[in-house]
Amino acid sequence: MTADLATATAAKEDGLYVYCVARGGGHHVLGPIGLDGQVVYTVGSGNIRAVVHSCPAEPYQSPDARVVEGWVVAHENVVRAATQAFGTVLPMAFDMIVRGGSGGGAVAALKAWMEERCDRLARRLDRLAGRAEYAVQVFWDRQEVAAWLVQGDEALRRMRDEAGS
């Protein structure tokens, strides 16, 4: 899909799903890497660009937790792809959708939002430069951790021994 076709598609939809914001302008197509395989592209305003896909102006919802998990993973994968393509990005929360308004469609609303916040977005991108976001999950067995703690602490061993008698 060309940048012009992506923009034309956005004009027909009433919403834009926003993954992140990065520096730079112009239109770039990242390809069909978005939620449900949507084509992801950028919408630029000045020296700021938003990484988006066209969508209906309503939240993504599913009663199936696996579907929602897939969407969240796809969202994160797009943010990573944008980071590789554009450098520092300011990630948006899952399911951030810009709707068109009385002044035009979703593209016009998004550009107006970026223009109003251009300086603030640039400062946030500057603060994030050279940093990365990580998620850490820790899984542990309570009994093993308790035994390890007791083994290394005399006071805990005494309390364990007193409680057992």
What name fits each language-model region?
Residues 2-165:
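An interfacial alpha-helical scaffold signature
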